[in-house]
């Protein structure tokens, strides 16, 4: 049966929403599996890797996707809970035709999402997603079903964890170890809860873990990169050298220095860029950040003579610009850091290991490395919105933004944008004085709230 209205389910990071509420319902997951299978049938007999995080609802969508794919003649390879970058790696390692991750990343347990990779582990282009949306809207899959002897089969990959662990460890030099480091590791009760502790323990670190007891309902709950205060406290309590906080699917990381201070994606990106620049490993002396990158990061790169490309917010756009501008390092403030020499997506474990390597090779504390970036005061307010009209169409908003930009001049920035995965408007203001930044951000947020908002968080 053809759907009666325009059908848009993909956002900037695949499909995402409240579990058991459209679009995150099993019927759409089944149809998505069939649509993906129909596209892949053009390649002949195909195989798809399917991974997930630890949300209770993952079982629902995993089974629906497998049913949809197999019904279209596609073989599926299940890896169970595994970080998103691990699924991208396994997709390449098995020479599969695509990979699927069931995860809502840093969101609470009651949300879920589905994102797809191509055979190289890159997220699918917008054109593929649009074609699948059109197929799902028409819902004419019965006409394309294969004969009964061509139905796909489902197989469990039992060594996916071990393969990914060895892949991650291979990005760390054999000549050094983590023997003298005490590390706090917060896995957010998410996809990294099994593999992440083993990576650091096998490299001989002393590891204090938290967020490693998922129950389906506690992913990202007061733990992980969205709640670094848990790792900060553990660093203090255990007198650790460093803290590592992953998000729910372990594609992003926030680090904590020995003084329990947060080291975010911008600073980690700068640390790694400087190291790669010195070793002549930074391709074209270029790094990709985003429009949200802190001005302190931009100025630190300028001092090095490193060009900064500013992409849209979202790791898929960072990666697109890395490919477009021939860069091998990119990332965003939230903790997605992409090393294209190692993987095709953000990888929290790989990023953390690169920073630890630099600490060891330079005999530096993380706080010393982080001091390279003199961060500008910055705030970001999130306003829940009832709709997403063009921001340019809201005259009062345009006026207040212009006023704030005039006040800041060349010493600050304003960025107002909609989230690609939530019904949220984000207001970012950056400038030389923290109190002024907060005041100006609130002025803009108040107008957003009055015009289209529900509540400010």
From Swiss-Prot:
Phosphoserine, modified sites: 105
Pfam families, per the entry: PGM_PMM_I (PF02878), PGM_PMM_II (PF02879), PGM_PMM_III (PF02880), PGM_PMM_IV (PF00408)
Cofactor note: Binds 1 Mg(2+) ion per subunit.
Cellular component terms per the entry's GO annotation: cytosol
Catalytic residue list: 105
Enzyme Commission number(s) of this protein: 5.4.2.10
Keywords noted in UniProt: Isomerase, Magnesium, Metal-binding, Phosphoprotein
GO MF annotations, alphabetized: magnesium ion binding; phosphoglucosamine mutase activity; phosphomannomutase activity
Reactions listed under catalytic activity: alpha-D-glucosamine 1-phosphate = D-glucosamine 6-phosphate
Co-factor(s): Mg(2+)
Enzyme class, first EC level, given as a word: isomerase
Post-translational modification remark: Activated by phosphorylation.
Chain's role: Catalyzes the conversion of glucosamine-6-phosphate to glucosamine-1-phosphate.
Similarity comment text for this entry: Belongs to the phosphohexose mutase family.
Protein name per its UniProtKB record: Phosphoglucosamine mutase
């Amino acid at each position: 049966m053809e759907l009666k209205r325009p059908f848009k389910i993909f956002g900037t990071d695949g499909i995402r929403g409240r579990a058991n509420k459209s679009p995150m319902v099993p019927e759409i997951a089944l149809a998505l599996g069939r649509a993906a299978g129909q596209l892949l049938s053009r390649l002949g007999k195909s195989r798809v890797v399917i991974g997930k995080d630890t949300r209770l609802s993952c079982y629902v969508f995993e089974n629906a996707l497998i049913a949809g794919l197999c019904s279209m003649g596609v073989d599926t390879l299940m890896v169970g809970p595994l970080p998103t970058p691990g699924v991208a790696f396994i997709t390449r390692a098995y020479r599969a035709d695509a990979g699927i991750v069931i995860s809502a990343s840093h969101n609470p347990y009651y949300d879920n999402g589905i994102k797809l990779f191509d055979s190289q582990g890159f997220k699918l282009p917008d054109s593929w997603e649009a074609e699948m949306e059109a197929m799902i809207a028409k819902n004419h899959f019965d006409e394309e079903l294969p004969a009964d002897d061509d139905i796909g089969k489902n197989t469990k990959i039992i060594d996916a964890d071990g393969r990914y662990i060895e892949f991650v460890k291979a990005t760390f030099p054999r000549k050094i170890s983590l023997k003298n480091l005490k590390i706090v590791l917060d896995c957010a009760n998410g996809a990294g809860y099994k593999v992440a502790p083993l990576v650091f323990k096998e490299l001989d670190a002393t590891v204090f873990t938290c967020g490693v007891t998922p129950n389906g309902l506690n992913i990202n709950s007061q733990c992980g990169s969205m709640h670094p205060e848990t790792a900060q406290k553990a660093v203090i309590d255990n007198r650790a050298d460093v803290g590592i906080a992953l998000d729910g699917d372990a594609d992003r990381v926030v680090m904590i220095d020995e003084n329990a201070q947060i080291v975010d994606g911008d600073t980690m990106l700068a640390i790694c860029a400087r190291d790669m620049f010195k070793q002549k490993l930074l391709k074209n002396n270029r790094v990709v950040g985003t429009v949200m990158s802190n001005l302190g990061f931009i100025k630190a790169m300028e001092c090095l003579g490193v060009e900064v490309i500013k992409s849209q917010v979202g790791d898929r756009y960072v990666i697109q610009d890395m490919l477009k501008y021939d860069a091998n390092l990119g990332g965003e403030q939230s903790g997605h850091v992409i090393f294209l020499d190692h993987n095709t997506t953000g990888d929290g474990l790989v990023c953390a290991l690169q920073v630890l390597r630099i600490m060891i090779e330079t005999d530096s504390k993380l706080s010393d490395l982080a001091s390279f970036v003199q961060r500008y005061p910055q705030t970001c307010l999130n306003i829940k919105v009832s709709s997403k009209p063009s921001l340019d169409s809201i005259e009062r908003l345009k006026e207040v933004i212009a006023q704030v930009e005039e006040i800041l001049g060349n010493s600050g920035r304003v960025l107002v944008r909609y989230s690609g995965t939530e019904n949220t408007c984000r207001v970012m203001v950056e400038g030389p004085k923290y109190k002024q930044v907060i005041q100006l951000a609130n002025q803009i947020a108040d107008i957003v709230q009055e015009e289209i908002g529900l509540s400010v968080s």
